Amino acid sequence: MSKFTVINHPLIQHKLRILRDKNTSTKDFRDLVNEIAMLMAYEVSRDMQLEDVEIDTPVAHATVKQLTGKKVAVVPILRAGLGMVDGVVKLIPAARIGHIGMYRDEKTLEPHEYFIKLPEDIEKREVIVVDPMLATGGSAKDAIAALKKRGAKYIKLMVLVAAPEGVKAVQAADPDVDIYAAALDDHLNQNGYIVPGLGDAGDRLFGTK
């Protein structure tokens, strides 16, 4: 079974409260998604490997740490996932960025893939899939399946708000993929929206419906 982590840092929870508010403007919503993603990336990257290296400081010779191991790819699920990319890349500037285009049929709630572009060496990279919402889990499962089909082996899923139904669905389909969220909400309503949630993240990010 994969690990599911809710990141309860006070700054994240405070910003998430503003994000949920229906009166928050498009600009503020966009800024907050970016800020929360950057803060979450600290926890998501906690297990990155380090190695010892020798350097000279202005004062003395020293043994210090630097990152080693796998390179990173950040893969947003379009379109709402785009809002989280800059925050992660600010923290991990060497990361490559892929894209997976998914849309959800509003009647069946089933996801459909319409675009995918990934780094050529995706099989060697640690992939962080980003999407603000984990609702039914359909889009996340399909995105992960598309990544695995193209060789990705090391995948994490980072979302802002998750529903229990979506977490269970992803864990059942992909027990090797760890999930990180800023909040675990109560349930999905009859329209497939997370309750209490934050509405349609894509619409609120881009100011379009």
From Swiss-Prot:
Signal sequence region: none
Pathway: Pyrimidine metabolism; UMP biosynthesis via salvage pathway; UMP from uracil: step 1/1
Keywords annotated in UniProt: Allosteric enzyme, Glycosyltransferase, GTP-binding, Magnesium, Nucleotide-binding, Transferase
Molecular function (Gene Ontology), one example: uracil phosphoribosyltransferase activity
Residue numbers binding uracil: 194, 199-201
Domain of life: Bacteria
Protein family (similarity comment): Belongs to the UPRTase family.
PANTHER family referenced in this protein's UniProt entry, alphabetically: ADENINE PHOSPHORIBOSYLTRANSFERASE, URACIL PHOSPHORIBOSYLTRANSFERASE, CHLOROPLASTIC
Name under which the protein is recorded: Uracil phosphoribosyltransferase
Protein's gene: upp
